[in-house]
Structure formats: structure tokens, C-alpha cells
Design a protein with these regions (language model features):
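Short beta-strand->loop
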Residues: 132-138
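A generic structural signal for short hydrophobic patches within well-formed alpha-helices
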Residues: 9, 42-45, 86, 124
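Active-site neighborhoods of divalent-metal-dependent phosphate/nucleic-acid chemistry enzymes
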Residues: 47-53, 61, 72-119, 144-146
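Histidine- and aromatic-rich ligand-binding microenvironments
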Residues: 4-5, 38, 98-99, 120-121, ...
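Residues at secondary-structure transition points
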Residues: 18, 36, 40, 58, ...
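Short, well-structured N-terminal submotif of metal-dependent ribonuclease cores
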Residues: 1-37, 51-69, 138-140
Length: 146
């Protein structure tokens, strides 16, 4: 199973200009039922959309509709951050703190035994996760970042 990072779900948006062909090709080779999102990814998307709605309402409105479609498409496959996830996340900050959202996404993936799919592989270094970068056409199915 794959936990898609924010940059991946954003890249896969239909009609996105300059969409990376490697990412689309990677996604098309996988059964979509294996794709999951973290509630933290929804937070990041929502934050970006709210900011865009303030400065460019038509574009913000278009992305709001896109996000509604994402939530519908991923119904039952959006993983929450829970009381079981919290200690896993806390441990990822010891001995070296990392950005909270990255740690929360990593902890969610660890809790469920999922791989993380991201362009920002260094954000998940030393977590013990299998990390996939679909922008690299030569990326193996799993790269261990432990």
C-alpha cells in the first residue's frame, strides 16, 4: 500500500500544466485501490487552497472542487492521525527533530505498514520507511530510508 505525499497528489491533478510524465506513468502502473492519503496531506492541501481563495478566487474555487473530488475518490482511504500514531511520531523526533508534518505523515505510514510516495525523499530519511520517488524513472519499487 502507498501513502501519497502532498506533492504527489498535487502532481497527479488532471489538467495540471507541465505534469511530470514519470509520475503519471508510475501511478498508472499501480492499482488505485492501493493509494491512501494522510489527513495531514488534506491539511496541507486545504491550507494552500484557502490561501489561493483569498488572492485568486477563481483558481481557488477550481482547486476547492478538485479537493472535493479527491476526498470522494479517496473515501475510506484517508488515514487519520490518532492516539496510536502520536507516540510513533514523537519517536521520529528523537534524537533529531524533523518538521512536524513530515513526521506525522511518516508515523501514519509506519503505523499502517505503508510505503511513502514523495518527491522529497530526504524528508523521510532515517524513518525506517520504504520511500518511492516517482519522478525518478529508475526508482525501484521501494527504497528503504532507514
Amino acid at each position: 500500500m502507498f501513502l501519497l505525499d502532498t506533492n504527489v497528489i498535487s502532481e497527479l491533478r488532471q489538467g495540471k500544466p507541465n505534469q511530470a510524465a514519470e509520475v503519471r506513468a508510475w501511478a498508472q502502473r499501480q492499482p488505485s485501490s492501493r493509494f491512501f492519503l494522510s489527513a495531514i496531506t488534506l491539511l496541507e492541501l486545504e491550507q494552500g487552497i484557502q490561501a489561493l481563495e483569498r488572492r485568486a478566487p477563481p483558481q481557488g474555487s477550481a482547486l476547492r472542487a478538485w479537493l472535493a473530488g479527491i476526498c470522494l475518490a479517496f473515501s475510506g482511504r484517508i488515514l487519520p492521525f490518532t492516539e496510536k500514531t502520536a507516540p510513533v511520531c514523537a519517536a521520529l523526533h528523537i534524537p533529531n527533530p524533523r518538521p512536524d508534518r513530515d513526521a506525522m505523515i511518516a508515523a501514519t505510514a509506519l503505523e499502517h505498514g505503508f510505503s511513502v510516495v514523495t518527491r522529497n525523499t530526504s524528508d523521510f530519511a532515517n524513518t525506517g520507511l520504504a520511500v518511492i520517488n516517482p519522478w525518478l524513472s529508475s526508482t525501484p519499487s521501494h527504497q528503504s530510508m532507514g
